[in-house]
Swiss-Prot record:
One Pfam family in the UniProt entry: Transpeptidase
Organism: Rickettsia typhi (strain ATCC VR-144 / Wilmington)
Highest taxon in the source lineage: Bacteria
Pathway(s) of this molecule: Cell wall biogenesis; peptidoglycan biosynthesis
Region of interest (Transpeptidase), residue spans: 398-711
Descriptive protein name: Penicillin-binding protein 1A
Length: 785
């Protein structure tokens, strides 16, 4: 008996020795090519870069992996306990691998196999860190052995808190969320500090199968997994029985970011992205760096600008009538057929519908959801002039675009025309709003900053400003008559004409500007000289290399909406240099400011993401550099207010504000513009086709773009007081006769004269410059074609 016992002990000892030898050999064999785990000390995870409006509303997120890094000290204990209960009960007690857990899982999996249930794993949190950071997801014995070895080694070097920090920030939780902070935001629109026990348990349940645990698709399975985690928290002593019952009894309610917490500004965000990438000289750092970018964007103005632009483009498009239905489908199983119609680009809030029946005064339509409605003929009148019957416009089976309005629908179509709008603070250069097109999802081409177009009459402002800078008086008389300009040897002569082809005779320079008379502008330009006009175009940043030709003065140069709006911003602020900017400051993932537009001390810049809604950025003290003198600047501002009061911008008078502005229409009406400003704001807008073509023979800045400006200002500034433009000391206001330009006490217009010209005016009471010599001009009596 003793011999048998001794034999078995001997065999057992040999087996133990053999097992230890094999284990030692395996460890020795696989330890030679293990990945370097020291890199975990320098953990620098890809994090989300977020762009915010000036008032803290989230505009956009950019990332390769949507992650917000959170130090372990900032993670609530209840969230940590949820993960310990769900993933690794003995985390704080084992050396990286849980031998008891492995044995328990082995016996449990035998039962699971016999009952056809899912197998349970025994990987610890440390092992998952190793797999996520250092190894692949390959299912092999070799990978598992390496995982165990490294897990043990890591546990001897890293603290449990360090391992948890790696795990909680690296793990994927579904819906594009990496790390617990991103998961809390994506699923519950909360910070991790705000999570309830039930919500913490839900997040802790996700790593097992993040793609499958979707409450929208499999609520009961997700809730069962969450409740299992809650029960484990109770069993492990983290929560009380009452807390467990309350948490299990709560439903899973997912929450998206509230609309009031975000702002849609796709073109603006894309511009910011490009600028920051250029600033950092690294696309990688932008997408991985976890930057916080605060912009100049005003969320309310952005929304109003977008609405005004879309409304203006749609109204222009409707004035040109209904093109045609998208398709025609059979009415048998019409709902399925309608679902199979490809969704048109830029549908936005519009809907697809199919015409089910038509009568003289309405159309019956069906929508994708199976509901039915009607379109009265009054909501189709725009489609065709003198529309008498719907039957002449639509037929059964026609697929059309509609818009819900009150208790019915209206016929609509997606505009082919496009445009842009930009809003600036003229004193700081802050871009308060920028909409680069009708729909970013369809066209990412930014018509604010990228589209080079001819500004038409917008250039005239700077021709007149050049004249005022060089001493030409605002009541100078010029002749609105035929003119021919000899452009030099070998060059054809140039015979400009007015928009409508008529001549109005002699008038003051002011009246010529207000009425946007081409021939007056050409005469003013010839009096000043092209050299000075080229200089002012470059000085105001409209075009860096304008061609020195006379057609330039009528807007044949190319510029962007951003450049020309900024040029008018310089006028609006009194002639001081300003540059449009989108970005106020940038912070890295640790909250350190790496860029600030203004270098002065900013006491409210050291803020966390959660504090952004209360952050106030100081208005910067700009480097003052004069682009033009304040007297000439006020004179041209006076002209621009006149263009609103009695010129091409007359329609804007309905706003009841003191506004300066100028319309612009290029040759053949291919590009239309309006830029208007007050002492506080400048708004530029443009409308045209991406492939330039005529908008219509009667299309002008006045009837195409000005309505967009009016709509925006009517909503954005309706409650703002009407502020006058400041009159500088170098200007004296004198009443003159609008027609003759003579100074008379009861003059019909108040003219702005430079103080150093007053004596000259008093000595020359009758201002008459009819016979002023302008070299290079030959007046023609015949009509110009």
């Amino acid at each position: 008996m003793y011999k048998s016992l001794f034999f078995f002990l001997k065999i057992f000892a040999i087996l133990i020795l053999l097992g230890c030898s094999v284990t030692a050999y395996i460890i020795y064999h696989y330890s030679h090519d293990l990945p370097d785990y020291s890199q975990l000390v320098r953990y620098y995870p890809p994090s989300v870069t977020r762009i915010y409006s000036r008032d803290g509303k989230l505009m956009e997120e950019y990332a390769f992996e949507r992650r917000v890094f959170v130090p372990i000290n900032n993670v609530p204990s209840s969230l940590i306990e949820s993960f310990i209960a769900a993933e690794d009960k003995n985390f704080y007690n084992h050396p990286g691998i849980d031998l008891l857990g492995i044995v328990r899982a082995a016996f449990l999996n035998i039962s699971n196999y016999l009952h056809n249930r899912r197998m349970e794993g025994a990987s610890t949190i440390t092992q998952q860190v190793v797999k996520n950071f250092l190894l692949t997801n390959e299912v092999s014995l070799e990978r598992k052995i390496k995982e165990v070895i490294i897990s043990y080694m890591i546990s001897r070097v890293f603290t449990k808190h360090q391992i948890l920090e790696l795990y909680l920030n690296q793990t994927f939780f579904g819906r594009g969320a990496y790390g617990v902070a991103a998961a809390a935001q994506n699923y519950f629109n909360k910070s991790i500090e705000e999570l309830t026990i039930a919500e913490s348990a839900f997040i802790a349940a996700l790593p097992k199968a993040p793609s499958e645990l979707n409450p929208d698709k499999n609520y009961s399975r997700v809730k069962a997994r969450r409740d299992y985690v809650i029960e484990r928290m109770f069993e492990d002593g983290y929560i009380t029985r009452d807390t467990m019952k309350e948490a299990i009894g709560s439903p899973i309610v997912l929450r998206k970011r509230a609309k009031e917490e975000t702002v849609t500004a796709d073109y603006y965000a894309a511009q910011v992205r490009e600028e920051v990438i250029k600033m950092l000289n690294s696309k990688e750092e932008f997408y991985r760096g976890g930057l916080t970018i605060i912009t100049s964007l005003d969320a309310q103005m952005q929304k109003l600008a977008e609405n005004a632009l879309r409304k203006g483009l749609r109204e222009f498009d409707r004035r040109h009538g209904f093109r045609k239905p998208i398709a025609n489908i059979p009415l048998d199983h019409w709902q399925e057929a309608l679902k199979n119609i490809p969704t048109p680009s830029s549908l936005l809030e519009y809907k697809l519908a199919v015409v089910l029946d038509v009568s003289d005064n309405h159309a019956k339509i069906g929508l994708i959801d199976g509901s039915k409605a009607r379109i009265p003929i009054i909501e189709m009148q725009w489609a065709r002039s003198n529309l008498k019957s719907v039957k002449t416009l639509l037929k059964k089976g026609d697929v059309i675009v509609v818009e819900p309005i009150k208790d019915c629908y209206a016929l609509r179509q997606i505009p082919e025309i496009n445009g842009a709008i930009m809003v600036m603070n003229p004193h700081t250069g802050q871009v308060l709003a920028s909409v680069g097109g009708y729909d970013f999802s369809t066209s990412k081409f930014d018509r604010v900053t990228q589209a080079l177009r001819q500004p038409g009459s917008l250039t005239k402002t700077f021709v007149y400003l050049a004249a005022l800078e060089n001493g030409v008086k605002p009541n100078q008389i010029f002749n609105d008559g035929p003119i021919e300009i000899m452009q030099g040897p070998g060059m054809p002569s140039w015979r400009p004409k007015n928009y409508e082809g008529q001549f109005l005779g002699e008038m003051t320079m002011r009246t010529g500007f207000e009425k946007s008379r081409n021939l007056i502008t050409v005469r003013v330009a010839t009096a000043v000289g092209l050299t000075k006009i080229v200089d002012i175009i470059k000085r105001f940043g409209i075009n860096n290399e304008p061609k020195k030709v006379y057609s330039m003065v009528l807007g044949s140069i190319e510029t962007t909406l951003s450049r020309i709006t900024n040029a008018y911003a310089i006028i609006a602020n009194g002639g001081k240099k300003v540059e449009p900017h989108f970005i106020e400051l940038i912070k890295d993932r640790n909250g350190k400011i790496i860029y600030r537009r203004d270098n002065r001390e900013c006491f409210s810049c050291n803020i966390l993401d959660s504090d952004l809604d209360t952050a106030i950025l100081e208005i910067p003290k700009e480097d003052i550099y004069r682009v033009t003198d304040e007297a000439s600047d006020y004179q041209i501002t006076s002209f621009l207010t006149g263009a609103i009061d009695s010129g091409t911008g007359y329609a804007a008078r309905k706003l009841g504000k003191i506004i300066a502005g100028k319309t612009g229409t290029s040759n053949d009406s291919k590009d239309t513009w309006f830029i208007g400003f007050t002492p506080k704001i400048v708004v530029g807008s443009y409308v045209g086709y991406d492939t330039p073509k005529e908008l219509g023979k009667k299309a002008t800045g006045s009837n195409v773009v000005l309505p967009i400006f009016i709509d925006f200002m009517n909503h954005a500034y309706k409650d703002e007081p009407s502020l006058p433009f400041k009159v500088p000391d170098s200007i004296k206001l004198i009443a003159v006769d609008r027609i003759t330009g003579k100074m008379i006490p009861d003059g019909t217009v108040i003219e702005a004269f430079k103080v150093n010209n007053i004596q000259m005016l008093e000595n020359d009471y009758m201002i008459d410059n009819h016979d002023i010599f302008i070299p290079g001009i030959s007046d023609q009596s015949q009509e110009i074609y």
